[in-house]
Amino acid sequence: MSTDSILTTVPIQWLSVDSPVLPDEVLDWLMELGSMTRRFEQYCNSVRIIPFRECFITEEQLSDENERLLTGQRYWLREIVLCGDNIPWLLGRTLIPETTLTGPDESLVDLGTVPLGRYLFSGNKLTRDYIHVGQQGNRWARRSLLRLSGKPLLLTEVFLPESPVYKR
């Protein structure tokens, strides 16, 4: 199995929310507090998930993400491509500490082609600590520390050029 990440081709430069390079219409997307899947569904007939990588990884395999999560354990890694009407719109990378995968949340390792947002936003046990916004080359990105029943997971999303984020 490859150890390459779907997001590692160009590093993400994390920015301040009030950075002058952030257009208001893009910031509106990046600061979305609800389900990005639901928002994308407003711009297409169907959303589809293509799994890229799903496996457990160790702390040593993390980049700067390790400072955002609990240390000293394994993490469930899920990397996907989200498509709207079969056009790639988003690269997603989810890191879930093994200690988060308890009770009903164990099913997070079995999502397969189900959008993460469908699971996360189906109940009221989700909170968000923060959203960081950034750029990866000419693509916009965001990273959120979410808590599911108080337990952390880190979600990084990179918006691809055909995404409605860039439509004016």
From Swiss-Prot:
* Location relative to the cell: Cytoplasm
**InterPro entries to which the protein is assigned, alphabetical:** Chorismate--pyruvate_lyase, Chorismate_lyase_/UTRA_dom_sf
Q: What is its EC number?
A: 4.1.3.40
Q: Which is one GO molecular function term here?
A: chorismate lyase activity
Q: In which pathway does it act?
A: Cofactor biosynthesis; ubiquinone biosynthesis
| Gene Ontology biological-process entries | pyruvate biosynthetic process; ubiquinone biosynthetic process
Positions with a binding annotation for substrate: M36, R78, L116, E157
Reply yes or no: does the keyword Cytoplasm apply. Answer: yes
| Subunit comment | Monomer.
Which NCBIfam families does the record associate with it?
PRK11655.1
Family indicated by similarity: Belongs to the UbiC family.
Protein name in the entry = Chorismate pyruvate-lyase
Task: State the organism named in the record.
Answer: Photorhabdus laumondii subsp. laumondii (strain DSM 15139 / CIP 105565 / TT01)
